[in-house]
Amino acid sequence: MSTSTVDIPPQFDVVDRPLDTQMTISMGPQHPSTHGVLRLELVLDGEMVVKSTPDIGYLHTGMEKLFEYRKYQQGIVITDRMDYLNPLGNNLAYVMAVEKLLRIEIPERAQVIRVLMCELQRIASHLVWLGTHALDIGAMTVFFYCFREREKILNLIEAASGGRLTPSYFRIGGLMMDLPSGFERRVKQFQDGFPKAVAEFHKLVTGNRIFQKRTQGVGYISAEDAIDWGLSGPSLRGSGVELDLRRMNPYTGYENYDFEIVTEADGDVWARYLVRMREMEESHKIVEQALCRLAPGPVKADAPKVVLPDREAMKTHMDALIHHFLIVAEGFDVPAGEVYQPIEASKGELGVYIKSTGGPKPARVHFRGPSFVNLSALPHMSRGAMVADIVAIIGSLDIVLGEIDR
């Protein structure tokens, strides 16, 4: 019986290769904590992260290009689908940018309602962050508590706009419609019960020693590095930088509200957690003040060539019917110019840049998304961390890939 030998190529001769202490693996997009839309390329030395590189684009939809083929008012529905956990914030930044180009003034009641709805949306966004962040680390129970409270807010948003996740409630020149009858009473009911819910969250998570061990001293970034990386929102304030656009560059009447800019100095996952927890309490305070400031009045600007008329006016005035037809069929011309409008969204600075060459459609729309910028600092935060800590660091940034990929 003959035998044969097979020559093994040198590159596969593992006996003669020195052992390499590093290896490269993919985390996601199938990993539960990356939710199917984010991949990280991790270079590991044992359990320690040497380098992490985010790989994005799994949720790319070409939103910014879509704006160029749609009239200004049609772009509102696109903004809903960026950060789909904070759609009203997206609506607000976009409509305010267009209103700047048009130079139209918004009625006081519409301004107050915008603040009211945005702060409710901020709480809802933070509730999703808290539930999923804790769930990824291993604290399962609080997830259900958070979504119980979020459901109450989504019911309020649905009552006002007809939509839950994609409300498109803010319109260029004001609001889609006024608040429905009994809305203020329903908000007060939510307000009365929310402090008790926050106390439950603290009992379940803040006092959890395992959660503390998983977050304290993890994902550290100094104030100087946070500024250099361009972080904003809770991710920046968690490093002790007191920057909030609602106070530093107030818009839609925020200068009239009393609230604290929440900061924590430690710069780790735990600090960013505490900032968002306290921010929910501050948003609760702002909602209370907005309810007190609500006064009767119009919710649409006096700009008949831009703002759709009421249904009753269309039935009784021919000019209102004509304006409605022209706005829907042809849109409205926006003066040529450029504008950048930033707001303090739930995840940080959300900025909208619009370039108009005149006409009913924008020449260019670009968004400065907080999640995109905050994610860029992940390699810095995760260097030297353990593999298990990556999940906690990602959660502390509160990123949404719909806004990152656009």
Predicted regions and their residues:
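Metal/cofactor-centered catalytic core regions of large enzymes
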Residues: 1-406
